[in-house]
Amino acid sequence: MAELSGEQVRRFFEKVIPARLRGGVPIVPVVRLTGVIGFSTPLRPGITISGVARLLERAFSYKHAKAVALIVNSPGGSPVQSHLVYRRIRQLADEKKLPVIVFIEDVGASGGYMIACAGDEILCDVSSIVGSIGVVGATFGFDKAIGKLGIERRVYTSGKRKVMLDPF
């Protein structure tokens, strides 16, 4: 005897039982987005558009869904991947005319927060770390102090921009 998948069972009941008799329990597909955004391997999973596109499309394809829920737990990572995931969520939400509700677990920072901003509503615990979109590079300039002390520094690179954040 063949075993039926959850999707096959759901489709069967949709065909056999009229919608008005099915109970009225709202369907809200959930997509979990966890980890660093960007490059991933089997041993180090991460969030990339190629890794989550099918999950998002599947969540937005539920026939009677009232909304799509995203669970975000990410410190951020690649700005490009963050934006691609954000954009795909908004495209699907607009196309399917479904609201997106985002739940931030422990952290939704940097690119994780950017993805969360694709939601129509963001919910989190009071202890969750939320916010901070942007790339920051901090450095100090000691060139005058080094010159006064007579220190000479030599750096050899294959291009000028490779040391543009060098504080010396």
Walk through the language-model features, giving the residues of each.
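Glycine-rich beta-to-alpha transition loops that act as phosphate-gripper elements at the mouths
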Residues: 102-109
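Small-residue-centered hinge/linker elements
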Residues: 1-98, 110-168
